[in-house]
From Swiss-Prot:
FMN binds at residues 10-15, 79-81, 114-120, 135. It is an enzyme of class 1 (oxidoreductase). It comes from Burkholderia multivorans (strain ATCC 17616 / 249). This is NAD(P)H dehydrogenase (quinone). NAD(+) binds at residue 12. Gene3D superfamilies: 3.40.50.360. Substrate binds at residue 99. Its cofactor is FMN.
Amino acid sequence: MAKVLVLYYSSYGHVETMAQQVAEGAKSVPGVEVTLKRVPETIPADQAKAIGIKTDQAAPVATVDELADYDAILFGTPTRFGNMAGQMRTFLDQTGGLWMKGALVGKIGSVFASTGTQHGGQETTITSFHTTLLHHGMVIVGVPYACSGLVNMNEITGGTPYGATTLAGADGSRQPSANELDIARYQGKHVAELAVKLAS
């Protein structure tokens, strides 16, 4: 049984929605156990409430040490100036002990993201995230062009060969589109299929 973790940070629910669909895609693969978790919020509760952070998310909070228990991890993050969110960075900066033990070497790592605007740094967020995963010796997996949603030219949409993405809009009012959610499910399924092969 291959074990897959979908681990995310979401400020306003967009990445949470994407993470749920990534998990659904992974669950569609036989022989896979899927866990959905989030990283801790680092903004003080009163400040988070004041700026509308979505704190009522059902996914439990992950611990750093449990990352070693999985065969594949799909990481989800909003972008912050072309990089991962600080909450995800803070979590990953605590993985030095895992790095020392080589605990993540050979495991699959994959990334999906959200930006406020069409050109808001989706691809750089994902590719800069890959640097951390490569330092851990993880095997990077994206979304191949076998996923038809990547070539959808009929609408403004997220989705890259580096990973699924969504556009939240500058005010956060835009929700993930059907095409973006399809790509998210594809990514989860694709990673899970590869995890089964590696685990066997």
